[in-house]
From Swiss-Prot:
Source organism of the structure: Nostoc sp. (strain PCC 7120 / SAG 25.82 / UTEX 2576)
Protein name as annotated: Recombination protein RecR
Zinc finger (C4-type): 56-71
Function: May play a role in DNA repair. It seems to be involved in an RecBC-independent recombinational process of DNA repair. It may act with RecF and RecO.
InterPro entries reported in the protein's UniProt record: DNA_Rcmb_RecR (IPR000093), Hlx-hairpin-Hlx_DNA-bd_motif (IPR003583), Rcmb_RecR (IPR023627), Rcmb_RecR_Znf (IPR015967), TOPRIM_dom (IPR006171), TOPRIM_RecR (IPR034137)
HAMAP family: RecR
Organism lineage: Bacteria, Bacillati, Cyanobacteriota, Cyanophyceae, Nostocales
Family that this chain belongs to: Belongs to the RecR family.
GO molecular function, one term: zinc ion binding
Assigned keywords, A-Z: DNA damage, DNA recombination, DNA repair, Metal-binding, Zinc, Zinc-finger
Keyword presence, Cell inner membrane: no
Domain Toprim, residue spans: 79-173
Gene Ontology biological-process annotations: DNA recombination; DNA repair
Superkingdom classification of source: Bacteria
Length: 197
């Protein structure tokens, strides 16, 4: 049906999250219509991003430096840490411009069905960070899916002996993801956070 190179391109594009066969085909055909210089720039940007972006050694957010811009920023509050599942959540919360503290990215949520337990997440570095920095508050901002709730409860219980632990209030449906919420909903959720019982 497709020439082999086009079929390979479509196959590779389908590996991206949220990209099905039709979208992959549409993207592939669009790429082929673009000037070669644009396609080369796209390919180079992909390779450079993969090579140059790593994880912050403090919070595990994506960064091109050993310590990310947020952790290096002296204007950010050191006494509040917001714990999220992944970097997309940091980006979503940053868009609200409401949170002035620092973050900790777990790298996912506890999901036994997917073979992800606490040891696959950055929970141990979080506990070490909280015991050393002694923040006044840790905010748990994890999406309210079944796995997210499990992770929130697990991490919350581990942190309670060290500091005040709150979670954001949700105007999101159960099973919804933070990255898809609008800025107003996220801002209200941050303002309405409450302490874990």
């Amino acid at each position: 049906m497709y020439a082999r190179p086009l079929a390979r391109l479509i196959e590779q594009l389908q590996r991206l999250p949220g990209v099905g066969p039709k979208t992959a085909q549409r993207l592939a055909l669009h790429i082929l219509k673009r000037p070669e210089s644009e396609v080369e720039a796209l390919a180079q940007a992909l390779v450079e991003a993969k090579k140059q972006i790593g994880l912050c050694s403090v919070c595990f957010h994506l960064s091109s430096e050993p310590v990310c811009e947020i952790c290096r920023n002296p204007n950010r509050e050191n006494n509040t840490i917001c714990v999220v599942a992944d970097s997309r959540d940091v980006i979503a919360l940053e868009k609200t411009r409401e949170f002035k503290g620092k973050y900790h990215v777990l790298g996912g949520v506890i999901s036994p069905m997917d073979g992800i337990g606490p040891e696959q997440l950055t929970i141990t570095p979080l506990l070490r960070r909280v015991s050393q920095q002694q923040p006044k508050e840790v905010i748990l901002a994890i999406s309210p899916s079944v796995e997210g709730e499990t992770t929130t409860l697990y991490v919350g219980q581990l942190l309670k002996p060290f500091t005040k632990v709150t979670r954001i209030a949700f105007g999101l449906p159960v099973g919804g993801d933070l990255e898809y919420a609008d800025e107003i909903t996220l801002a209200r959720a941050l303002e309405g956070r409450r302490e874990l019982d």
